[in-house]
Amino acid sequence: MIDKNDITGLILAGGRASRMGSVDKGLQNFHGMPLAMHTLLRLGPQVGDIMINANRNLAAYEAMGAPVWPDALPDFPGPLAGFAAGLERCETPYMVTAPCDTPNFPADMVSRLADALIAEGAQIAMAATTADGALRTQPVFCLMRIDLLDSLLEFLHSGQRKTEIWANQHRCAIVRFDDAQAFAGANTLAELRQLQS
């Protein structure tokens, strides 16, 4: 069993949000609060510590009460750059990630990922849902050991960017969640409106 105090949560808010007109997605209003604040309030009780990966509007994210770390790599290279920024600063043995645009992920997600990581002797545990009868991984919802930092940096410096390709280089437990809607994110303003309805 992994104690929640041994896990740091990382909110991924460093993307370009090109499908949302390049606005800062984590700062978009959702039921009266920024999307990223919903993620922080959902993730916070599941972990011992929390931080945010963002590349714009850093003061607005810092006002949410968590340390904010930008990508070390330029040009919005994707979630793995956020993973690296978090792993470089993580002071617990494990780190779990959640994107800023998915405010309804399960309240027991972290404990379920942690249980699977231990049960399967894995280095990474990744959430998955079923869509149209097929298992679909949710690669930005994953728990990892922090000793994977060197592997991740090597992967990024080779020019690779796909989370699943990197994760599959390690022992990865896939954890199925029944409610696919819990992992619904807002990639466009229309999807954000749909989430609010």
UniProtKB/Swiss-Prot annotation:
Monomer. Keywords: Cytoplasm, GTP-binding, Magnesium, Metal-binding, Molybdenum cofactor biosynthesis, Nucleotide-binding, Transferase. One of its GO terms (biological process) is bis(molybdopterin guanine dinucleotide)molybdenum biosynthetic process. Belongs to the MobA family. The keyword Secreted does not apply. GO terms for molecular function: GTP binding; metal ion binding; molybdenum cofactor guanylyltransferase activity. It comes from Bordetella pertussis (strain Tohama I / ATCC BAA-589 / NCTC 13251). Mg(2+) binds at D101. Its cofactor is Mg(2+). Its main location: cytoplasm. GTP binds at L12, A13, G14, K25, N53, D71, D101. It is an enzyme of class 2 (transferase). This is Molybdenum cofactor guanylyltransferase.
